């Protein structure tokens, strides 16, 4: 993989500050399947004030205002959500290229992903585990944690490095989440436990969503991991 790839298509990004007013700490926010860059922007007032947020739109249009990072299919028998390797690889490499293009403007870069956006955030972490101050992973999953797909095995060749570095990850999910299946939760938990410095919180009564309590924990976590300077 090229260490400094150039993204073929510049993504649509909603920034919390205009270019001349951006702070030195960047938080990249990645929405879930069927949403867009505005979906999580309501979190901005509840996040640490010294962080600049870049909410990125996923590249695959589903319908007006609705996008995905890669296609998802549903098993007709089990209902399990799945995906094929190549679209995942293309999406992760394109987003990684954009991050590489903008990261030089900031002192720190952190990630926040919800649902399919969590899959993307943890995938970015697997490509470059030293690059991120922390990752906030909400109500989602880790892509192919057992590296069963050859094309993804090639992409995530640094998983052993991730386990050595132990990057900081906050993983929050709802106990009543109907979208992410229990087997997917279990394999995600196993991968995170084996590879990262994990803070895990399960929220009783919460579905596939973010509640006020979780948002407070996210704010505290980011403030601790990315402290204000000066």
Regions found by a protein language model. Name each.
Residues 34, 144, 175-180, 208-209:
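Acidic catalytic loop of the alpha/beta-hydrolase fold
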Residues 5-110:
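Serine-hydrolase catalytic machinery in alpha/beta-hydrolase-like enzymes
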Residues 65-73, 140-168:
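Flexible "cap/lid" loop of the alpha/beta hydrolase fold
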Residues 113-117, 121:
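Gly/Ala-rich beta-loop-alpha elbow adjacent to hydrolase catalytic centers
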């Amino acid at each position: 993989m090229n260490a400094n790839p150039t993204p073929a298509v510049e993504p649509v990004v909603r920034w919390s500050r205009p270019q001349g007013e951006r702070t030195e700490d960047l938080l990249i926010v990645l929405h879930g399947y069927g949403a867009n860059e505005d979906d999580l922007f309501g979190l901005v007032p509840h996040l640490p004030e010294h962080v600049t947020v870049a909410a990125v739109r996923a590249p695959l249009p589903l319908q007006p205002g609705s996008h995905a990072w890669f296609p998802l299919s549903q098993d007709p028998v089990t209902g399990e959500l799945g995906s094929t390797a190549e679209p995942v690889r293309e999406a992760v490499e394109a987003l990684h290229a954009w991050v590489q293009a903008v990261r030089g403007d900031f002192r720190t870069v952190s990630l926040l992903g919800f649902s399919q956006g969590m899959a993307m955030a943890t995938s970015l972490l697997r490509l470059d585990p030293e690059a991120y101050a922390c990752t906030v992973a909400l109500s989602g999953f880790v892509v192919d944690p057992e590296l069963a797909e050859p094309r993804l095995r090639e992409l995530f060749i640094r998983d052993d490095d991730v386990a050595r570095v132990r990057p900081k990850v906050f993983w929050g999910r709802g106990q009543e989440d109907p979208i992410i299946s229990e087997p997917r939760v279990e394999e995600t938990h196993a991968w995170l436990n084996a590879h990262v410095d994990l803070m895990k919180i399960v929220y009783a009564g919460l579905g596939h969503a973010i509640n006020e309590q979780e948002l407070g924990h996210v704010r505290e976590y980011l403030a601790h991991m990315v402290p204000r300077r000066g």
